[in-house]
Amino acid sequence: MPRFPAPGSRVSVRYLAEGAHTDVIGHLLAVGPRIEVRTKSAGTVSIPSDDVVAIRELSHTAVRASEIRNLEHAAALAWPGTEQHWHRGWLLRAGGGHTSRANSAVPLDFSSAIADLEPIVEWYRERELDPWLAVPDRLLAVRSAGVKHTRVMVRDLDRTPVTVTAVLRDRPDAAWRTGYRREVPDEVLTAVVDGEVVFATVVGVAGARGAVTVAPDGTAWLGISAVHVAEGHYRAGHGRAVCEALQIWGADRGARRAYVQVLEDNDAAIALYAALGFGLHHHLRYIDARSLLRTSL
């Protein structure tokens, strides 16, 4: 049985009805032995949960492919690794293997194509790295399921006054690394292309990274990442505190919107971002480019 999104989500459901696959799109009202989906044209559809073949959460408003491409461009500049190379519309990033974002190629131009993968594979081979592709929905027609399924969530930014309890620094110090469970070098964490980066810390308790970069359409985006809370300090509002501090910092630097990238199975992080006003924009997944060279698309 598939994993169901929370009630209230807008979803696309494929299910079995009289031995054939049927699709429905609408808002998920209830989850249980039966799920209920409110549609625009057919009212509320009740479906036995066991008959659901696949269910996918959708953004609440229509998102154009160009909007996805613009956001992904800003996000790639915000996590560029320590080395970058453009190849026929693909931005290749390398950062010593630390983090998927800093060590993957992302298609950022209309010209990006699967036919161009062999040079990408070779570029990563020369650096002794696996040739991962970060593939956002709708930018490339690829059938591979991939791994690390990720949702990209967004919200508009404003300068709503809040009490800031986090300290902001331009580098990740020992206090920031408290509770950060990854050994990512400073040169990878601080890397940004044509933008600014900052690190928010509630000393000894929590931290997060923020970066402001600009998309090709001129939109300045704040990317929030590496949000972490030290063990023993969960559910006390510290994650919210560092995120709110970063949102104010980003707004002060001209960012109009903010985004986060979060793994689909990280329910706690998704709940935090939803509480902060973030909603689904699109999905992405990681695919080993070598697997696409060996199979037909």
List where the protein language model places each region.
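Conserved acetyl-CoA-binding loop of GNAT-fold acetyltransferases
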Residues: 143-147, 274-283
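SH3/SH3-like beta-barrel fold
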Residues: 13, 34-40, 47
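Conserved acetyl-CoA-binding loop-helix of GNAT-fold acetyltransferases
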Residues: 113-121, 226-231, 235-252, 257, ...
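Conserved beta-strand-loop-alpha-helix junction that forms the acyl-donor binding cleft
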Residues: 133-139, 231, 260-270, 286-293
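Acyl-donor-binding surface of acyltransferase catalytic domains
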Residues: 78-81, 91, 98, 111-177, ...
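Conserved GNAT acetyl-CoA-binding A-motif
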Residues: 127-136, 250-261
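Flexible, substrate/cofactor-facing loop regions flanked by secondary structure
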Residues: 161-226, 231
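N-terminal charged segments
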Residues: 1-8, 18-24, 29-30, 43-126, ...
